[in-house]
């Protein structure tokens, strides 16, 4: 190792900063977070530091640097653009065996600042030993995405409970197993949902040997296909799953992000070929959770938009199973954005309506009169099979047969296809589109030719012949 990683306790310790500009201000912000007592040596201060001085947050020595200013200082940072001054600060500190950092000048550093992921009291520090700071920053960003923000609560509660756990468990191995179970089980799940009191109750039950073998269900929206649209929260929950129930709308790229040793069960349904009934899926969620497993129900798009997620959670709730919901990017938002079709536009559409092509068998007919009105966008899910009836009803109720339409197949994926035509051609377009497909009806479709951005540039065809844009 070029550097030994250390965590320094700076609370109320004097730290000297030489320099009063923006770079100094960035370092001072870190020092404040660590509770340091900051002294600044500079002839002038930036407006930000001037305000901190007025607020009493820093001490200011409005003079030139002198070596004796290092007396009784814990460490020093030189943050000026004067290389001679910076070298003098380092030399004086080195002579006194005081840790020194000259910003962006590694040879003049006896310590360096790492990239930091702050989940205090849990702190992760990453360093490239000054060789590749951009790489360290990229790794920090990846860890920021993977580490839940609630880790700070988890670490704080664990700190408060260490003494009690030690009193109950004399063996270090026993204590280690206790915390391993807590950090990967129901205690961690409760923390992630912000249920801190319940989480501490769970620790108490575990200490008393009353831990219930009860799992939980997480309803997670997988988004429309592109794995990059999966939410950070969704990724974190998927990485903790014991078993994942997924449907056919979940892309392989998203499934690849599931924890490697998690069991995967396909409960997908297709029109006319339901491989698993909804009732069987509902019961399976309950059964698996009652076995103490962390169950993820992974649904394409958003689970509460035509995904029957509400029905599934009603059954889970009635069984007394804990659950949580992680929203996802719904297909109408994701697919249209990737196709360059805004759902609303000041000049073309003041409203948007989401419609499902799969209606309840005993449901009322749609309000076609309202849907046929102009200056609105219709986004129809699972509507390819009924495209002919949709077109006929809208035209019969007053919508122009030349209204622009788009059928977006496999939206947001690398093989996305966008088919453009008119309302009269909707059935033909739907027959050509790969599934899953979204129907979009309204004048906003015309903007596709101007602002399509994903994959190849749009290919404009005549209004008579539908255009196909293959974005593979």
UniProtKB/Swiss-Prot annotation:
Pfam families reported in the protein's UniProt record: CysG_dimeriser, NAD_binding_7, Sirohm_synth_M, TP_methylase
Database matches in PROSITE patterns: SUMT_1 (PS00839), SUMT_2 (PS00840)
Pathways per UniProt: Cofactor biosynthesis; adenosylcobalamin biosynthesis; precorrin-2 from uroporphyrinogen III: step 1/1; Cofactor biosynthesis; adenosylcobalamin biosynthesis; sirohydrochlorin from precorrin-2: step 1/1; Porphyrin-containing compound metabolism; siroheme biosynthesis; precorrin-2 from uroporphyrinogen III: step 1/1; Porphyrin-containing compound metabolism; siroheme biosynthesis; siroheme from sirohydrochlorin: step 1/1
Ranges where the record places region Uroporphyrinogen-III C-methyltransferase: 215-472
GO BP of this protein: cobalamin biosynthetic process; methylation; siroheme biosynthetic process
GO molecular function, one term: uroporphyrin-III C-methyltransferase activity
Positions of NAD(+) binding: 22-23, 43-44
Keyword field contains Cell inner membrane: no
Protein EC: 2.1.1.107, 1.3.1.76, 4.99.1.4
Keywords tagged on the record: Cobalamin biosynthesis, Lyase, Methyltransferase, Multifunctional enzyme, NAD, Oxidoreductase, Phosphoprotein, Porphyrin biosynthesis, S-adenosyl-L-methionine, Transferase
Record: active site: 247 (proton acceptor), 269 (proton donor)
Catalytic activity: uroporphyrinogen III + 2 S-adenosyl-L-methionine = precorrin-2 + 2 S-adenosyl-L-homocysteine + H(+); precorrin-2 + NAD(+) = sirohydrochlorin + NADH + 2 H(+); siroheme + 2 H(+) = sirohydrochlorin + Fe(2+)
Signal peptide positions on this chain: none
UniProt-annotated binding residues for S-adenosyl-L-methionine: 224, 300-302, 305, 330-331, 382, 411
Segments of this protein annotated with the region Precorrin-2 dehydrogenase /sirohydrochlorin ferrochelatase: 1-203
Residue positions where Phosphoserine is found in the record: 128
Gene3D superfamilies, per the entry: Cobalt-precorrin-4 Transmethylase, Domain 1, Methyltransferase, Cobalt-precorrin-4 Transmethylase, Domain 2, NAD(P)-binding Rossmann-like Domain, Sirohaem synthase, dimerisation domain, Siroheme synthase, domain 2
The family this protein is said to belong to: In the N-terminal section; belongs to the precorrin-2 dehydrogenase / sirohydrochlorin ferrochelatase family.
Function field: Then it catalyzes the NAD-dependent ring dehydrogenation of precorrin-2 to yield sirohydrochlorin. Finally, it catalyzes the ferrochelation of sirohydrochlorin to yield siroheme.
Name of the molecule in the record: Siroheme synthase 1
Organism listed in the record: Yersinia pseudotuberculosis serotype O:1b (strain IP 31758)
Source species taxonomy: Bacteria, Pseudomonadati, Pseudomonadota, Gammaproteobacteria, Enterobacterales
């Amino acid at each position: 190792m070029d550097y030994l990683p250390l965590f320094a306790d700076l609370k109320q310790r004097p730290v000297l900063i030489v320099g009063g500009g923006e770079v100094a201000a960035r370092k001072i912000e870190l020092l404040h977070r660590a509770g340091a007592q900051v002294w600044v040596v500079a002839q002038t201060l930036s407006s930000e530091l001037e305000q901190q001085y007025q607020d009493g947050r820093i001490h200011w020595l409005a003079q030139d640097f002198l070596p004796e200013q290092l007396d009784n200082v814990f460490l020093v940072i030189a943050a000026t653009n004067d290389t001679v001054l910076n070298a003098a600060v380092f030399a004086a500190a080195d002579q006194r065996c005081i840790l020194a950092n000259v910003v962006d000048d590694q040879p003049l550093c006896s310590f360096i600042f790492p990239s930091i992921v702050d989940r205090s009291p849990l702190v992760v520090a990453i360093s490239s030993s000054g060789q590749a700071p951009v790489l360290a920053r990229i790794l920090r960003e990846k860890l920021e995405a993977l580490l839940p923000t609630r880790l700070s609560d988890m670490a704080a509660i664990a700190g408060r409970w260490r003494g009690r756990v030690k009193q109950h468990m004399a063996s270090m191995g026993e204590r280690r197993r206790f915390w391993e179970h807590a950090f990967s089980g129901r205690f961690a799940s409760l923390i992630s949902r912000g249920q801190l009191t319940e989480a501490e109750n769970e620790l108490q039950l575990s200490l008393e040997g009353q831990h219930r073998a009860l799992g939980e269900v997480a309803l997670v929206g997988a988004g429309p296909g592109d794995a990059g649209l999966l939410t950070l929260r969704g990724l974190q929950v998927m990485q903790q799953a014991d078993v994942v129930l997924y449907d056919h709308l979940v892309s392989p790229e998203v499934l690849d992000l599931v924890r490697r040793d998690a069991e995967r069960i396909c409960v997908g349904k297709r029109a006319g070929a339901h491989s698993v009934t909804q009732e069987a899926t509902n019961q399976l969620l309950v059964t698996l959770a009652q076995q103490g497993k962390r169950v993820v129900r992974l649904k394409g798009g958003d689970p509460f938009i035509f995904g029957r997620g509400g029905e599934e959670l009603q059954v889970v709730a009635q069984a007394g199973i804990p659950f949580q919901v992680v929203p996802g990017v719904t297909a109408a938002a994701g697919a249209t954005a990737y196709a360059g079709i805004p759902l609303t536009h000041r000049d073309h559409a003041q409203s948007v309506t989401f419609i499902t092509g799969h209606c309840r068998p005993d449901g009322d007919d749609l309000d076609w009169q309202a849907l046929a009105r102009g200056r609105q966008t219709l986004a129809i899910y699972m509507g390819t099979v009924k495209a002919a009836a949709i077109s006929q009803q809208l035209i019969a109720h007053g919508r122009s047969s030349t209204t622009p339409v788009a059928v977006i197949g496999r939206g947001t994926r690398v093989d996305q296809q966008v088919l453009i035509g008119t309302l009269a051609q909707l059935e033909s377009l739907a027959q050509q589109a790969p599934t899953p497909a979204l129907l979009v009806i309204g004048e906003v479709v015309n903007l596709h030719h101007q602002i399509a951005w994903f994959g190849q540039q749009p290919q404009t065809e005549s209004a008579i012949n539908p255009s196909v844009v293959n974005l593979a």
